[in-house]
């Protein structure tokens, strides 16, 4: 056990070496990206040893080695929880990040601030590992906020672009809403249970835990881009491609799902929270899959597919299968990072062209990248015996055999079928057919940094699912709950659907083009959500505040109440006064004339 804890800490310490080198200025600036990549590769190899020990023994460990603070009866100490989730996730995160770092050395080689970029990526990984290994809520919150601020810095890396700044701000603001939920949960646990340690919270297991769990669900909604707080995730594509790959594979977006998985001892008997996560996940996975169907930006399609997969993980938590959701996090990291890296390779080769309508015919021009892209797309759809199949098939089976909430599960099944549509669409538009890009574009994928990084993830996308699913406890084969013919039906329906799609495509490709339907507009404009939330709501707020400011302050207070009220009173007094002109001679004359006329009339009557 001593070796287990020591090597686990060495893994984390190895990652801090390049940052200390940068602080002490003991490095050659041109070699810094190589130092970072090497440190992560060594950390991955080191992390495999305690992971293998854990798989062999199944013994969890809590390392608590530095007491930090005591507030009355609350003890805060630096403690690491080396359990099933952290031990399985750490090697996956390190392996994927190692490949992304190598890819970044090729992709960002001309950037003048490449050393700072690598430092940011490394800090991003470290904060995620702090979040994963944290044993108390305070330490978890440090990692939680760490991935938030690093995502802001990395999405807005090209700060000269207005879109990048807007996207970075969006990411922060949407996550702030989620953080309110996290802080609410922390406050509730502190006031009611007087502890932030996870094992104590699980041991006390409060019966009325709806309030903190709603807070944690809100936090997961913000961080994992569930419906309502989802627009920041496709906008995050404004950052460099390595950032998109790291953000969407093994770091920030899975942090929210990971938080709910961490708290599964509280959620497993709470039907209310399970219903919330199930419905939220179902809406998210269907909505984002619909949005992905008509997008033309290659990175946006992959981003929406990430959001759809996060919704699927949320559904899995909702049907009380946290271990299955965690398995999907681990398998999803490999092919999602590879998909982003392949799209980055294509974008780089086509002079920053991201529109799939302007690609085509890349299968012969970039054979390796396109092979990896096809394998990644097939793994995403859950093609048998690729990595995605080992988790996705089990999720669909668990959903089909679940007795809860039929409409949510039906939405999930429709969304998973949409996955096949947008994955095939990328392959069809970007890789097949005639080239639709300018003839003078120089396509080159012969860089070892690019080839090796994608190759490593390609092997992961082919075999990681099998390796992970055969090594995680329990290793016994579960009993099949679904009839055999239903399992084979899925494969038959897939083949029939493919043949039918080809036939319909051949039949309709020469038909006259019609004006886009409402469903097409709904999908293309992302369900009108950004238009309403980012335009209409701020416009209404601004116009209301402007009217209230101008009406309440200017028209009412500064005009109606004080000056106008006083002026009206004074005007009445002044008109009363100015009615008398002060012409005494005229008054006397009029008085005299009146007397004379009256006397004359009196005398006349006599």
From Swiss-Prot:
The keyword Nucleus does not apply. GO terms for molecular function: NADH dehydrogenase (ubiquinone) activity. The keyword Transport applies. Its EC number is 7.1.1.2. It catalyses: a ubiquinone + NADH + 5 H(+)(in) = a ubiquinol + NAD(+) + 4 H(+)(out). Its main location: mitochondrion. It is a multi-pass membrane protein. Core subunit of the mitochondrial membrane respiratory chain NADH dehydrogenase (Complex I) which catalyzes electron transfer from NADH through the respiratory chain, using ubiquinone as an electron acceptor. Essential for the catalytic activity and assembly of complex I. Core subunit of respiratory chain NADH dehydrogenase (Complex I) which is composed of 45 different subunits. PANTHER family: NADH-UBIQUINONE OXIDOREDUCTASE CHAIN 5. NCBIfam families: NDH_I_L (TIGR01974). This is NADH-ubiquinone oxidoreductase chain 5. The lineage of its organism: Eukaryota, Metazoa, Chordata, Craniata, Vertebrata. The gene is MT-ND5.
């Amino acid at each position: 056990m001593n070796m287990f804890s020591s090597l686990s800490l060495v893994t984390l310490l190895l990652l801090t070496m390049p940052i200390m080198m940068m602080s002490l200025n003991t490095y050659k600036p041109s070699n810094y990206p190589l130092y970072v990549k090497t440190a992560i590769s060594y950390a991955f190899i080191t992390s495999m040893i305690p992971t293998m020990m854990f798989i062999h023994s199944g013994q969890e460990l809590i390392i608590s080695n530095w007491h930090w603070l005591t507030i009355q009866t609350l003890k805060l100490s630096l403690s690491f929880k080396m359990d099933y989730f952290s031990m399985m996730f750490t090697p996956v995160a390190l392996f994927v990040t190692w490949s992304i770092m190598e890819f970044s050395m090729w992709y960002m080689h001309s950037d003048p601030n490449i050393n700072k970029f690598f430092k940011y990526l490394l800090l991003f990984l470290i904060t995620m590992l702090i979040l994963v290994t944290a044993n108390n809520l305070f330490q978890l919150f440090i990692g939680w906020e760490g991935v938030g601020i690093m995502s802001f810095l990395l999405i807005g890396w090209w700060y000269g672009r207005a879109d990048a700044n807007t996207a970075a701000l969006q990411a922060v603001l949407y996550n702030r809403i989620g953080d309110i939920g996290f802080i609410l949960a922390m406050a509730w646990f502190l006031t009611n249970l007087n502890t932030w340690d996870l094992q104590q919270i699980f041991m006390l297991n409060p019966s009325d835990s709806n309030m903190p769990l709603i807070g944690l669900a809100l936090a997961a909604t913000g961080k994992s881009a569930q419906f309502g707080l989802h627009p920041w995730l496709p906008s995050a594509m404004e950052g460099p491609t390595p950032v998109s790959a790291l953000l969407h594979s093994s770091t920030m977006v899975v942090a929210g799902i990971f938080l709910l998985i961490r708290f599964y001892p509280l959620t497993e008997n709470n039907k209310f929270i399970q219903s919330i996560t199930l419905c939220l996940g179902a809406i998210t996975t269907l909505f984002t899959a619909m949005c992905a169907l008509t997008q033309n930006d290659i990175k946006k399609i992959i981003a929406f597919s990430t959001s759809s997969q996060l919704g699927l993980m949320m559904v899995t938590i909702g049907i009380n299968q946290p271990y299955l959701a965690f398995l999907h996090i681990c398998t999803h990291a490999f092919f999602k990072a590879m998909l982003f890296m392949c799209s980055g390779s294509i974008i780089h080769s086509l002079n920053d062209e991201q529109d799939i309508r302007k690609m085509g015919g890349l299968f012969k021009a970039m054979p390796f990248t396109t092979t990896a892209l096809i394998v990644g797309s097939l793994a995403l759809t859950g093609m048998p015996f690729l990595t995605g199949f080992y988790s996705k098939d089990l999720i669909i089976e668990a959903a089909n055999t679940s007795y809860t909430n039929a409409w949510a599960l039906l939405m999930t099944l429709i969304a998973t079928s949409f996955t096949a549509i947008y994955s095939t669409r990328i392959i069809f538009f970007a890789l097949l057919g005639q080239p639709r890009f300018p003839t003078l574009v120089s396509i080159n994928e012969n860089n070892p940094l690019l080839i090796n990084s994608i190759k490593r993830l390609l092997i992961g996308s082919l075999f990681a699912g099998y390796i992970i699913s055969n090594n995680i406890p329990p290793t016994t084969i579960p009993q099949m709950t679904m009839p055999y013919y239903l399992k084979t039906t899925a494969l038959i329906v897939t083949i029939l659907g493919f043949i039918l799609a080809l036939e319909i495509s051949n039949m309709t490709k020469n038909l006259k083009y019609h004006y886009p339907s409402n469903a097409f507009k709904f999908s293309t404009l992302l369900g009108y959500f950004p238009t309403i939330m980012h335009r209409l709501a701020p416009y209404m707020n601004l116009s209301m505040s402007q009217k209230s400011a101008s009406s309440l302050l200017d028209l009412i207070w500064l005009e109606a109440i004080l000056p106008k009220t006083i002026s009206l009173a004074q005007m009445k007094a002044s008109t009363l006064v100015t009615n008398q002109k002060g012409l005494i001679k005229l008054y006397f004359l009029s008085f005299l004339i009146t007397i004379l006329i009256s006397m004359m009339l009196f005398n006349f009557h006599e």
